[in-house]
Amino acid sequence: SMGGHCVTHTCGHDERFFRHLVLVDPVIMDPQLYQSSSRHQYADVSEHPIARRRSHFADAQAMYDRYAERSPYALWNPRVFRDYCDFGVVPREDGEGMELACPPEVEASIYMGNFDSDLYDLIPDIDTPVVVLRAEPRDPESQTMDFTASPTWPQLASQFRHAQDVYLPELTHFIPMQDPQLVADFIIAGASVQPVQSGTE
């Protein structure tokens, strides 16, 4: 998601820190979207659906009970969702229950800022091997924000010098939450890749 966007940005500026990239449904969209004057769907962060998420709960169990049967959480691995509830909230400063560790307004502002972060000038020069895991893409004609669909441009992998495209239509944008072992396997495989040696000894 945004993590994939961030590590791609960092790798594009300094590859010394990377041996292999595993981009899990990264928020790197169709390049045309970054050029569109209407790319900002919401005028203010407060209008973004993420900013309107419920953020206050009596405790982690209350959060679990509220969302366990709802989409997209019902699709997640149960242990992952339990961890999300147990570790994704922190005590409120006023002592009245718990709140999301990442305030919804902050999360929304990060996603809105992404529309001003075009990485396509950096991507073609990245030599680091890349794997792009992506789910079923979003409908470009839809005006509804579907958080389960992939924001990743389907042609993204082809823009890197050395990349593998892994299409996972049976999964949603929440790939690590649904199949953590699959993601772990790709990370383990990437970690075993030997660094490219430049020059001669």
Feature roles, as predicted:
Residues 32-37, 143-146, 178:
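Short aromatic-enriched loop/helix-cap "lid" or pocket-rim segments at secondary-structure transitions
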Residues 158-201:
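Catalytic active-site module of serine/aspartate enzymes centered on a nucleophile-bearing elbow/loop
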